[in-house]
């Protein structure tokens, strides 16, 4: 029996909340909190007849730590699930520390204003020291490790699919399939079609910033950075087919390089259609992906935030998206002195997700792991104090929960490898 405060009410949060309500014996009470309380009220009203979980709602501006502290003190939760924006990770972590409550999220911290001088100085130092230039990285949240450990609290970082399940797949491979892992390729394929000329499947601002940034991968103990979308490969995905995929920087590479140090190379690939890439490059060329505020008719606006307002809401894509996703990890390494390959992945159907929770599969594949991560913390399966990513915990109960609640794994011991 647990009380959980869930901050966020977008597409991913909606899925996570639906799934929490399917496990009322653990999620006895939940409070849905967002800047827009009306969205929380609407979702609570929809779910109330379907669950015995007691649902309340609240308004909170998660950019303001004092508001989050006040809400936590008023509600007294056992866990705070941060399913808002990565910009708000640190304020919510600060609030959890102030109130003595465990914390979890689905994506690592990045700043909303990348021109802030104080942040910029630290960022530029990290670029030189680490060797990659992505705006998002774990260093900001890892810096909280001692504080959470001394407070006897756990902060679980990145319990979505990628990051999240992909790291659990790596921990599973290390525990059950390999003595040593040599290479890891993380493949994220969305074979869905929503019918729009251009739309993003999750928060447009976060998505477009991620894919327009330089790519990078880990090789032989250091980062290799490349121009955005400059490495392209083809792969034949189970239940989806042949797709073009591009090497991106992705946050789990950073933690996997730390926690599976014998890995000689770790890469992340994501599929994109040509129409998406053409639109993205055009928008970038005209400055619409910029995060720098501009003055327009006497009002300050951020171009990428204005673009977000024009694009379809990812939460609205569910009824019109058809097809499947396929996300997983391909490994090479050794077991009992012999060379070995292994592929573990999940295939998820957009329309089946919509039938169950009114969502497309991108939100579903992030929201279900968020609930399963919370389940691990609330049931005592994962108890290590401090700040940790998913691969640092026992993967078995987490993957079993994913199998049970909608994201079953598939395996191959003779997969096609990604061409070097």
Predicted regions and their residues:
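Glycine-rich Rossmann-fold phosphate-binding loop(s) that bind the pyrophosphate
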Residues: 9-10
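Conserved Rossmann-fold cofactor-binding substructure of NAD(P)-dependent oxidoreductases
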Residues: 61-77, 88
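C-terminal catalytic/substrate-binding lobe primarily of soluble NAD(P)-dependent oxidoreductases
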Residues: 175-420
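N-terminal Rossmann-fold NAD(P) dinucleotide-binding loop
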Residues: 13-14
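N-terminal Rossmann-like NAD(P) cofactor-binding module of classical short-chain dehydrogenase/reductase
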Residues: 72, 78-81, 103-105
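Glycine-/Pro-rich loop/turn segments that contact NAD(P) or position catalytic residues
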Residues: 86-89, 93-202
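Rossmann-fold cofactor-recognition segment
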Residues: 50-64
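Helix N-cap at the beta1-alpha1 junction of Rossmann-like dinucleotide-binding domains, i.e.
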Residues: 36-39
């Amino acid at each position: 029996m647990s009380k959980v405060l869930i901050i966020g009410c977008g597409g991913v949060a909606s899925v996570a909340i639906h799934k929490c309500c399917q496990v009322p014996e653990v999620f006895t009470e939940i409070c849905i909190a967002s800047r827009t309380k009306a969205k929380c009220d609407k979702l609570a009203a929809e779910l109330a007849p379907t669950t015995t979980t007691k649902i309340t709602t609240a308004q909170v501006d998660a950019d303001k730590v004092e508001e989050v502290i006040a809400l936590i003190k008023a509600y007294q939760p056992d866990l705070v699930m941060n399913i808002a924006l990565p910009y708000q990770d640190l304020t919510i972590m600060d609030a959890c520390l102030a109130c003595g409550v465990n914390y979890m999220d689905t994506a690592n911290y990045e700043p909303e204003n990348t021109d802030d001088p104080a942040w910029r100085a630290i960022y530029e130092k990290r670029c030189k020291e680490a060797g990659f230039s992505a705006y998002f990285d774990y260093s900001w949240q890892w810096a909280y490790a001692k504080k959470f450990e001394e407070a006897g609290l756990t902060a679980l970082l990145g319990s979505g699919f990628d990051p999240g399940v992909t790291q659990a797949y790596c921990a599973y491979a290390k525990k059950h399939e390999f003595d040593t892992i040599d290479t890891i390729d993380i493949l994220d394929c969305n074979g869905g079609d929503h019918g729009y000329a251009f739309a993003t499947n999750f928060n447009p601002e976060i998505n477009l910033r991620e894919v327009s940034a330089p790519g990078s991968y880990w090789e032989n103990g250091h980062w290799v950075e490349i121009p955005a979308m400059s490495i392209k490969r083809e792969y034949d995905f189970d239940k989806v087919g042949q797709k073009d995929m591009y090497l991106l920087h992705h946050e789990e590479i950073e933690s996997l390089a730390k926690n599976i140090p014998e890995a000689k190379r770790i890469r992340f690939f994501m599929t994109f259609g040509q129409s998406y890439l053409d639109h993205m490059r055009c928008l970038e060329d005209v400055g619409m992906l910029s995060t720098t505020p501009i003055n327009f008719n006497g009002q300050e606006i951020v171009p990428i935030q204005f673009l977000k307002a024009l694009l379809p809401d990812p939460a609205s894509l569910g009824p019109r998206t058809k097809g499947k996703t396929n996300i997983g990890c391909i490994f090479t390494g050794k077991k009992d002195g012999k060379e070995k390959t292994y592929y573990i992945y999940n295939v998820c159907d957009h329309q089946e997700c919509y039938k169950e929770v009114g969502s497309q599969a991108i939100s579903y594949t992030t929201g279900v792991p968020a609930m399963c991560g919370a389940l691990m913390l609330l049931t005592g399966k994962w108890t290590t104090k401090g700040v940790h990513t998913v691969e640092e915990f026992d993967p078995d109960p987490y993957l079993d929960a994913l199998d049970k609640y909608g994201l079953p794994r598939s395996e191959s011991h003779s997969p096609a490898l990604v061409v070097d």
